[in-house]
Curated annotation (Swiss-Prot):
Cofactor(s) this protein requires: pyridoxal 5'-phosphate
UniProt-listed GO biological process terms: ceramide biosynthetic process; sphingosine biosynthetic process
Oligomer and partners: Heterodimer of sptl-1/sptl-2.
Functional pathway: Lipid metabolism; sphingolipid metabolism
Catalyzed reactions: L-serine + hexadecanoyl-CoA + H(+) = 3-oxosphinganine + CO2 + CoA
Identification of the protein by name: Serine palmitoyltransferase 2
Organism: Caenorhabditis elegans
Keywords, sorted A to Z: Acyltransferase, Lipid metabolism, Pyridoxal phosphate, Sphingolipid metabolism, Transferase
One Gene Ontology CC term in the entry: membrane
InterPro entries from the UniProt entry: Aminotrans_II_pyridoxalP_BS, Aminotransferase_I/II_large, AON_synthase_class-II, PyrdxlP-dep_Trfase, PyrdxlP-dep_Trfase_major, PyrdxlP-dep_Trfase_small
Family note: Belongs to the class-II pyridoxal-phosphate-dependent aminotransferase family.
Length: 558
């Protein structure tokens, strides 16, 4: 039977059988409403609160800001490739000149004592480290010596051997911080979070000095897990002391070699590692592309595992809420619809979206007006919006109990430090309004306002910005590898701390400056950053957008 005939048969089967047992979400991507239709209320599980209006700080649920990925012209793309080619050619020349002794450069030579050691990097990785990364190493790995709030103190350092080693004169520089994931501004050295975290040390100390299964977890962590489940509107939750391990070490507990993982193209490294460790078959769909996802789902059901020619026992879709390098928001309603249609499971990583998205900070599930029970595995981290460390997995009690018994990171690792658990508990309570104030709601609203203002101003100034206007992650494309060093150094010289990203973290032609907006930022601070970026963009001719005319006469309010 031909592939086309199989697909047609599958369509008939799905329409006659699966649709009888499942219903498709009413909230769909870019859903249109009739003029005479009354505005519908979207039900969201909020514990004691049953419903919320379909209109919030982001506008109507059915009219969310789309993800934008403006492309550059071919000529600029060719120029970027030529820049990389020139970089590699001169790097090879430098390697040969140094190797044959024409130029003395002891800093990049291997120590004779290390000749018998196993290489840490492949040949290309070592070559790239020696000749490309080392030239701009000074804009990365900058040590900080203060709380990473709206401003942060950077330790000054100088290098006399091409960034191989550093000297520290003992001074520091205070900069506007647009590089940390401090979305809601809870990274503070004073206030209720810091005070209650400090008091928890007196009660419970700094560590339990054991694993969860030997002596158990702290009272603070037990309280936190109950609060996380209440906050998300699910049955249960489990917390871990490391966010990266929450993904990488728990995925193998959910799937095995008889399962299929369908992963978004731009998923985080922790998810990719988890997929590899699980032993499951893995297929990648194009970023946020529902047609690509459905095509893989259809083929997986129609043909099964190509190695065994048997049906997969389980199909798990893995996506993120906000993608940290793209600034885009996942199309959750579309993904849930396909998940239900094809009887798959859904794993949602809300590391960057929990606390930062939604009317009450409950992530992209609330942002889209979806039911949290439609997501099988809700994952998130506490390193961003909560100003702490660690991660969580939430969902049904059966799933969480399975992880408590089978997860290596829960079984062998130490439980969460009590002051960290208390920091998360206090900040989450503020977000939920349990402190009796509106501080949490005001932080969420201020973050949304800051993010929209900053993004729109960059677009108005002629820069290409990826992602959604509602996202606090703002990637500004600069493309050329040399631009990363230029922006990193010039921004620091003007007392602004930002993150520049290039290959291998991104594609070779998509170098970028990534701004992370915070509720702690004032309009004056954002304007100062925008003024500096605009100046550097003019100096380096990195205003590549062809759509700036669409925003020229638009009044952008804060």
């Amino acid at each position: 039977m031909s592939r086309r005939t199989d697909s047609l048969c599958l369509d008939e089967y799905l329409s006659s059988e699966l649709k009888k047992r499942t219903h498709i979400l009413e909230c769909a991507w870019n859903q249109e409403h009739d003029d005479d239709e009354e505005e519908e209320e979207v039900k969201v599980d909020q514990g004691s609160e049953e419903t919320t209006s379909s209109h919030d700080i982001y506008g109507d649920v059915g009219k969310r800001a789309p993800n934008e990925f403006e492309k550059i012209d071919r000529l600029t793309t060719i120029k970027v490739y030529i820049a990389w080619l020139a970089l590699f050619v001169f790097a090879h020349i430098r390697e040969y000149v140094t190797r044959f002794g024409f130029v003395k450069d002891l800093s990049s030579k291997e120590n004779a004592k290390m000749k018998d050691f196993v290489p840490l990097f492949s040949d290309f990785e070592a070559f790239y480290q020696r000749n490309c990364y080392i030239k701009v190493r000074d804009v990365f790995e900058r040590p900080i010596c203060s709380v990473p709030g709206a401003t942060v103190d950077l330790v000054d350092r100088v290098s006399h051997d091409g960034n191989w080693t550093y000297e520290y004169p003992g001074t520091r520089t205070n900069v506007i911080n647009v590089g940390s994931y401090n979305y809601l501004g809870f990274a503070q050295s004073a206030g209720p979070c810091a005070e209650q975290s400090a008091s928890s040390i007196d009660r419970e100390g700094l560590s339990c000095c054991t694993t969860v299964h030997e002596r158990g977890r702290s009272v603070s962590q037990a309280k936190l897990e109950k609060l996380v489940a209440e906050f998300l509107g699910v049955e249960d939750a489990i917390c871990f002391s490391m966010g990266f391990a929450t993904n990488s070490m728990n995925a193998p507990c959910l799937v095995d070699k008889h399962s299929l993982i369908i992963s978004d193209k731009y998923n985080h490294a922790s998810l990719i590692l988890g997929c590899r460790l699980s032993g499951a078959s893995t297929k990648v769909f194009e970023h946020n592309d529902m047609e690509s996802l459905e095509r893989i789902l259809r083929d997986a059901i129609a043909y099964g595992n190509p190695k065994t020619h048997r049906p997969y026992k389980k199909i798990l879709i893995i996506v993120e809420g906000i993608y940290s390098m793209e600034g885009s928001i996942c199309n959750l309603p579309g993904i849930i619809a396909l998940k239900k249609k094809y009887q798959a499971y859904l794993y949602l990583d809300e590391a960057h979206s929990i606390g930062a998205m939604g009317k009450t900070g409950k992530g992209v599930v609330e942002y889209w007006g979806c039911d949290p029970k439609d997501v099988d595995i809700l994952m998130g981290t506490f390193t961003k919006s909560f100003g702490a460390a660690g991660g969580y997995i939430a969902g049904s009690k059966r799933t969480v109990d399975h992880l408590r018994a089978a997860s290596p990171t829960g079984y062998y690792s130490s439980p969460m430090s009590p002051p960290i658990a208390q920091q998360i508990y206090t900040s989450m309570s503020i977000i939920m309004g349990k402190d009796g104030t509106k501080d949490g709601a005001q932080r969420i609203e201020r973050l949304a306002r800051n993010s929209h203002y900053f993004r729109m101003k960059l677009k108005q100034n002629g820069f290409i910005v990826y992602g959604s206007n509602d996202s606090p992650v703002v990637p500004m494309l600069i493309y050329f590898p040399t631009m990363c060093g230029f922006y990193g150094r010039e921004m620091l010289a003007r007392n602004i701390g930002c993150v520049v990203v290039s290959f291998p973290a991104t594609h070779m032609t998509e170098g970028r400056v990534r701004f992370c907006i915070s509720a702690a930022h004032t309009k004056e601070q954002l304007d100062e950053v925008l003024e500096t970026v605009n100046l550097l963009g003019s100096m380096s001719r990195s205003k590549f957008s062809k759509r700036s005319h669409l925003y020229k006469n638009q009044k952008i309010e804060w």
